[in-house]
Amino acid sequence: MEYRSLTLDDFLSRFQLLRPQINRETLNHRQAAVLIPIVRRPQPGLLLTQRSIHLRKHAGQVAFPGGAVDDTDASVIAAALREAEEEVAIPPSAVEVIGVLPPVDSVTGYQVTPVIGIIPPDLPYRASEDEVSAVFEMPLAQALHLGRYHPLDIYRRGDSHRVWLSWYEQYFVWGMTAGIIRELALQIGVKP
C-alpha cells in the first residue's frame, strides 16, 4: 500500500475488512482505554496530544487521549470517549466509533484498549490545562508509514521489551503511542 495516497475511504475499508486478531494472555487486569481520533478529511489526520510536564506519570509524552476505566463507564469505549472529552473537549456525540484494536499491556500495569473513532475536521479542541500541554494533528498517511519507526530494546527486571521511536515535527512519538500506531498500520495491511 502506498502510504502517501491514503484516503479516509481507503482507511475505513481496510480497517473494516481486516479485523484484528485478539488472542493473547494479559498479566494486567486494571482496564484503561485510549481514543485514536482520525480526523475526517480527504487525506485524514491523526489527532495526538502532548501530556503536561506537571503530571506524575508519562509527563511530557505524546499520547492519545485516554485513561483508566472507572466505575461510571459502561465499557472501555465509554471510558475512551469520556477521557477524550475531559482532555481535549471532543464531545462523545461527535465521535463515530468504528472499532477497537487488541488491548496492549502497559508498563504501569494497565490493559489498554485502543478505540478507533472518526471525528469531524472542525472541532474546536480545548486542552485540559491540568493534563495536556499541546494538541496536534499528524497526517494519517505519515503516521502509518512503518519506516518512520525505529526499534529500541529495553531490558527491565530481567525481561526484554521492544519500544518504537519516531519524530513528527518537534514531537517525539514513542513507547505505547508509537506501538499502537504501528499496530493500526499493520491492521490495515501496511507492509513493514
Swiss-Prot record:
Gene Ontology BP terms: nucleoside diphosphate metabolic process
Function as written in the Swiss-Prot or TrEMBL entry: Probably mediates the hydrolysis of some nucleoside diphosphate derivatives.
Residues covered by the Nudix hydrolase domain: 29-160
Enzyme class label: hydrolase
Cofactor(s) needed: Mn(2+); Mg(2+)
Binding site for Mg(2+): 83, 87
Enzyme Commission designation: 3.6.1.-
Position of sequence motif Nudix box: 67-89
One GO MF term attached to the UniProt entry: coenzyme A diphosphatase activity
Pfam families xref list: NUDIX (PF00293)
The species this protein was found in: Shigella boydii serotype 4 (strain Sb227)
Listed transmembrane segments: none
Family assignment from sequence similarity: Belongs to the Nudix hydrolase family. PCD1 subfamily.
Alphabetical UniProt keywords: Hydrolase, Magnesium, Manganese, Metal-binding
Claim: Cell membrane is one of the keywords in the record: no
Protein name per its UniProtKB record: Uncharacterized Nudix hydrolase NudL
Gene3D superfamilies assigned to the protein according to its UniProt record, in alphabetical order: Nucleoside Triphosphate Pyrophosphohydrolase
